[in-house]
């Protein structure tokens, strides 16, 4: 008798589990058919926001990263160009204090020549060599190599003007 009751309980459990599984499948099917893919397709075809950076007589463009720090930085620049006195630090970057703080998305990264980095939320750096630390990458300068960037940034202080295209 106990065996039959156990057998019936097991059958009921299997039946309950299989009906739950079916109820979970049904709601996900319509979601998969929603037109979200067209929205993401249009987002993928949008051109990325570009920064313009002028150092001495040279103009660069830089592609913004996709993070809240880069978005806040670009939004700030829509109010007008920002010119900073940048000084050399460690023979691998130019750094300047920002007029305000920005949100941080720090993570361990390896920088390379052309990286524009937010440091501690209130400084911006242009890297012309490598470094590794917890940083927030704001952008990368397009089509520039280490040697060319070192020539343009040179030794000592430079004035850099940041704007959005």
Regions found by a protein language model. Name each.
Residues 2-10:
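Sec-dependent signal peptide recognition
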Residues 15-16:
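C-terminal motif of bacterial Sec signal peptides marking the signal peptidase cleavage site
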Residues 23-50:
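N-terminal, intrinsically disordered, polar/charged segments of Gram-positive cell-envelope systems
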Residues 46-48, 68, 112, 121, ...:
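Extracytoplasmic
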Residues 48-90:
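N-terminal secretory signal peptides
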Residues 72-120:
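Mature extracytoplasmic domains of secretory-pathway proteins
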Residues 128-143:
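Short, compositionally biased
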Residues 140-165:
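Well-ordered alpha/beta subsegment
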């Amino acid at each position: 008798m106990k065996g039959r009751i156990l057998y019936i309980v097991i059958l009921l459990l299997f039946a309950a589990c299989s009906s739950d599984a079916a109820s979970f499948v049904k709601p996900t099917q319509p979601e998969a058919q929603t037109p979200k893919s067209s929205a993401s397709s249009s987002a993928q075809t949008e051109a990325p926001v570009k920064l313009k950076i002028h150092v001495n007589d040279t103009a660069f463009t830089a592609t913004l990263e996709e993070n809240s720090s880069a978005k806040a930085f670009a939004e700030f620049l829509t109010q007008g160009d920002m010119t900073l006195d940048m000084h050399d630090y460690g023979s691998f970057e130019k750094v300047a204090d920002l007029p305000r703080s920005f949100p941080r998305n720090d993570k361990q990264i390896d920088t390379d020549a052309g990286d524009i980095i937010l440091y501690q939320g209130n400084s911006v750096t242009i890297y012309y060599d490598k470094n590794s630390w917890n940083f927030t990458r704001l952008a990368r300068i397009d089509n520039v190599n280490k040697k060319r960037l070192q020539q343009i940034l040179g030794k000592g202080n430079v004035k850099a003007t940041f704007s959005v295209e």
